Structure formats: C-alpha cells, structure tokens
Amino acid sequence: MRIDVVTIFPAYLDPLRQSLPGKAIQSGLVDLRVHDLRRWTHDAHRSVDDAPYGGGPGMVMKAPVWGEALDEIASAETLLVVPTPAGVLFDQATAARWSAERHLVFACGRYEGIDQRVVEDAARRMRVEEVSIGDYVLPGGESAAVVMIEAVLRLLDGVLGNPASRHDDSHSPALDRRLEGPSYTRPPSWRGLDVPEVLLSGDHARIAAWRREVSLQRTRERRPELLADPVGPQDDPGR
C-alpha cells in the first residue's frame, strides 16, 4: 500500500515512523510519503491561503496550489481522503474498506479548510471521501490523518505480531460491532482489586461467555446506539 499525505506541517506526521506503523514502513509493507504543500507555490511568500469569498473570519486554502499537488501525486486509482469536521464519520468499517486500497492520499487542510472546488475537481478523475473522526473541530487535518492511517495500517497483514488480536477488537465484526470488554494481567490481586474469578478458572467456554456478556454490558452502558436490540441480559457477568 502507498500512502501520500499533503500538509503544510510535514513534521506532524512523524509519529507514524514509530511503533507498529514505523515497522510496517521499514519492512516495506507501506510506502508512506509526506509532502509539503508549499512545494507547489510560486510566489515569494509561498502562500497557500487567501480571504474567503463572501466574507467571514479566517482564511481558505487556495485551489491552484492544491490542484497542482494532486495533479502530481494522485491518479485515477487513488482514493483521496479529505479530513474535515463536515465529513462523514470515520469508523472501523471504513478503516477495513480502506485497508484494501492500493493508494491513499490524505489532503490535510488548515484554517477554514480547502477551497471546495479542489474536492469537486478531484472527484472528476478519482474517488474522493470527505471524512470526520468525530463531532469536534481540530486546527487541521494532520492529527485526524494520523488517527485514520494508524487504524488502517493495523488491519494490514503482517503489521500486528499476532493477527488474532484484531479478532475481538471493539467495533469488529466478531463482536457484532460492540465494544471490547476489560483486560487483566498479573498479579491476580492488586490494591484490593481482584481479577474476575472466571478468568482464572481455565474454563474456556465460561470465559468466552463472560467476555460476550461484559462486551454487551459495556456497550449498553457507553454506546447503546451500537446495539440493534438494546434490551439484553442484565446479569452481572463479573461473578
């Protein structure tokens, strides 16, 4: 997979060189290329923004600069991702779908965003998705791009040391899109808090049933909208 990120702050993407994403890059599973948008400017000030038509606060990123950048980087096979609080909500299903792509390009806007004509022009020759990572506003698209790229990379074969660890992730199909339950490790007792007895029993069927129940309980309490049928067992699964 190849991933290109266009931004005016290339160093913002440096965390992707760490941990599992970094290993994926070093091993050649992912070809990550980060580009400074100012490379496609032609004025002495290397300006990438201008005042918005119609008035209003803030500045808008200029179409000609973005157009040249995408002309050079993207192709008809590209999926262009534009992080924006006005986009559709990014989720695990989106990450899974993108993990099958050969080429992703992230266009990271700043200020009041990118001139909408950039999206409209790109959509004439490639697929474009405007995507949000949540109902809040960030200073720019870089941190959202890091979040989405990490979510995609961990789904690629060879990135995780144990691929089975994806099986019971929150929002995974194996959990019917529910939340993953709590995890515990040694010691069995710590500061007066004990690991649930069922996890020490060695009874794998009972443990699996407990995990299903706590997953349902946690989802009901924290994200009830994820449940097709919010009415379910009310038993305490921690015993």
Swiss-Prot record:
Primary subcellular site in the record, as a coarse category: cytoplasm
One GO MF term: tRNA (guanine(37)-N1)-methyltransferase activity
Catalytic activity, reaction form: guanosine(37) in tRNA + S-adenosyl-L-methionine = N(1)-methylguanosine(37) in tRNA + S-adenosyl-L-homocysteine + H(+)
Keywords: Cytoplasm, Methyltransferase, S-adenosyl-L-methionine, Transferase, tRNA processing
Binding site for S-adenosyl-L-methionine: 109, 133-138
InterPro entries: Alpha/beta_knot_MTases, tRNA_m1G_MeTrfase_C_sf, tRNA_m1G_MeTrfase_TrmD, tRNA_m1G_MTases_N, tRNA_MeTrfase_TRMD/TRM10
Biased composition (Basic and acidic residues): 165-180, 217-226
EC number assigned by the record: 2.1.1.228
Biological processes annotated in GO: tRNA N1-guanine methylation
Residue ranges, annotated region (Disordered): 163-187, 217-239
One Pfam family this sequence matches: tRNA_m1G_MT
Top-level taxon in the UniProt lineage: Bacteria
Record's subcellular location: Cytoplasm
GO CC, alphabetical: cytosol
Cited Gene3D superfamilies: 3.40.1280.10, tRNA(m1g37)methyltransferase, domain 2
HAMAP family: TrmD
Stated family: Belongs to the RNA methyltransferase TrmD family.
Role description: Specifically methylates guanosine-37 in various tRNAs.
Entry-linked PANTHER family: TRNA (GUANINE-N(1)-)-METHYLTRANSFERASE
Quaternary structure (record): Homodimer.
Protein name, entry field: tRNA (guanine-N(1)-)-methyltransferase
Record gene name: trmD
